């Protein structure tokens, strides 16, 4: 009620006599863009709340003794640089291959299931890595490998980006180039999160 309303007011400044005239409309709770109620760039706060609520059963399980075998298996699979880079990336890409054809736009509202699941994967894997001391240490021990991988994936990402800007030309259909760009972007996102 403090950060976002000035942004909405500025977008509709010609419709109101002043800020306080506008601010009253925020409490009508009419969703943006028809109304003045929105989370705008604070969408991630609602997403984090929903992820936390949806994953409560997983949080409880991962902290219980029943998860010992699961954690050992996950630790074994994800503790190598290749495992920690590729397994989560492939899962993230798989979710997007299924969802993005139906939810292609990044709107950050509650009907944006494609990007909601995309960011939830990051949240889930973050919890998974943090919950296992060996995995957490493996990230630190393999930081150089992770950095090299993150830098390496920038090459195809920017080549494809430059194609869209007309600097580089590829002979493939635009749909193929957009798909490759999205895939390299997902790899780059996960690799960068692990590196940082």
Q: What do these predicted ranges mean?
A:
Residues 1-196:
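Alpha-helical transmembrane segments and their immediate juxtamembrane cytosolic regions
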């Amino acid at each position: 009620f403090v950060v976002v309303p000035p942004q909405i007011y500025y977008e509709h400044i010609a419709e109101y006599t002043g800020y306080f005239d506008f601010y009253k409309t925020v409490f009508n709770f009419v969703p943006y863009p028809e109304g003045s109620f929105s989370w705008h760039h604070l969408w991630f706060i609602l997403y984090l709340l929903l992820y936390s609520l949806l994953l409560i059963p997983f949080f409880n399980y991962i902290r219980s003794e029943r998860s010992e075998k699961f954690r050992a298996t996950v630790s074994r699979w994800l503790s190598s640089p290749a495992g920690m880079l590729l397994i989560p990336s492939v899962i993230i890409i798989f979710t997007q291959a299924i969802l993005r054809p139906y939810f292609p736009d990044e709107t950050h509202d509650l009907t944006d299931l494609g990007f909601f699941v995309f960011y939830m994967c990051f949240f889930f894997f973050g919890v998974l890595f943090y919950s296992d001391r060996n995995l957490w240490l493996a990230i630190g021990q393999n930081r150089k490998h992770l950095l090299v991988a993150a830098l390496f994936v920038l090459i195809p990402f920017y080549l494809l980006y430059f194609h869209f800007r007309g600097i580089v030309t590829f002979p493939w259909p635009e749909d193929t180039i957009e798909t490759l760009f999205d895939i390299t972007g997902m790899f780059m996102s996960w690799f960068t999160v692990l590196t940082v």
